[in-house]
A protein has these predicted regions:
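Sec-dependent signal peptide cleavage junction
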Residues: 27-44
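N-terminal capping segments
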Residues: 40-98, 137, 151-153
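Bacterial N-terminal signal peptides that target proteins for export
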Residues: 7-19
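Short, Lys/Arg-enriched N-terminal segments with co-localized hydrophobic residues
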Residues: 1-4
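Low-complexity, Gly/Ser/Thr/Pro-rich intrinsically disordered linker/tail segments
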Residues: 171-176
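Generic recognition of cysteine residues
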Residues: 27, 82, 91, 129-133
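...with weaker cross-activation on analogous glycine-rich loops/strands in unrelated enzymes
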Residues: 46-48, 87, 95-168
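Bacterial N-terminal signal peptides
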Residues: 18-29
Length: 176
C-alpha cells in the first residue's frame, strides 16, 4: 500500500511539474493582452541587440567605407564607417535589404556619445554588452561585446576588428 501511495505522489509531482513547465512556456512566448510573441517583441532595440549586431557585422566581414552605414557596396558586401556600424543597428531592415535611414537616431560618433544616458572612463566599464566605447575627441567608436572585447569598423584596408579594450586606446564608455 505504501508503494502505491508513493507512486501516486510521484505521478502527481510529475504531472504538476509538466503543467508548470507548460504554463511557463506559454507565458514566456505570448505577452499578456497583446498576442505578440517574444520573437516579435525582441525587435526592440537593446544593448544586447547592438552587441549581437556588431558581432554579426564582424563575422559577415563588413568593409570600411567613410560615411557608409551598412548598405551593400558594389561588391555585394555591407560597408560602414565606425559610427555607421552603430547607426545601422537602429535602422536595420533584414539580412537581404539595404538600411533604411532614420534620422531620429544619432549618426555621428559625437552625437552617439552625447545621446548616451550614462558614460564613464574606460576603467570603470560595466559588464554590459552593447555599450559604445570612444577614443579621444570622439574620433572613433566601437561596440563593447563582453569579455573585455570590442568590435569596430576601423579604417580603409583594416575593416572590422575584434580586439581587447586596451588594444585601441579606448578612453570612455557610453550607454545608449
Amino acid at each position: 500500500r505504501n508503494t502505491t501511495m508513493q507512486n501516486v505522489k510521484k505521478l502527481s509531482r510529475t504531472a504538476a511539474a509538466f503543467l508548470l513547465a507548460a504554463l511557463i512556456l506559454i507565458c514566456s512566448t505570448v505577452l499578456p493582452n497583446t498576442g505578440t510573441t517574444v520573437s516579435a517583441a525582441s525587435a526592440e532595440l537593446t544593448s544586447i541587440g547592438l552587441a549581437e549586431h556588431a558581432l554579426k557585422a564582424y563575422r559577415d566581414g563588413w568593409q570600411y567605407s567613410y560615411g557608409a552605414y551598412g548598405n551593400f557596396n558594389s561588391n555585394g558586401v555591407r560597408a560602414s564607417d565606425c559610427s555607421g556600424l552603430i547607426y545601422s543597428y537602429f535602422c536595420w531592415v533584414d539580412d537581404n535589404s539595404n538600411i533604411q535611414p532614420n534620422w531620429n537616431y544619432p549618426r555621428t560618433v559625437t552625437a552617439q556619445a552625447n545621446d548616451a544616458v550614462e558614460s564613464g572612463p574606460i576603467d570603470t566599464i560595466p559588464r554590459t554588452h552593447g555599450l559604445i566605447v570612444t577614443i579621444a575627441n570622439y574620433d572613433h567608436v566601437g561596440v563593447y561585446v563582453g569579455n573585455g572585447m570590442v568590435v569596430d569598423n576601423s579604417t580603409w584596408g583594416v575593416n572590422m576588428r575584434y580586439e581587447s579594450i586596451p588594444g585601441h586606446g579606448w578612453l570612455q564608455w557610453h550607454k545608449l
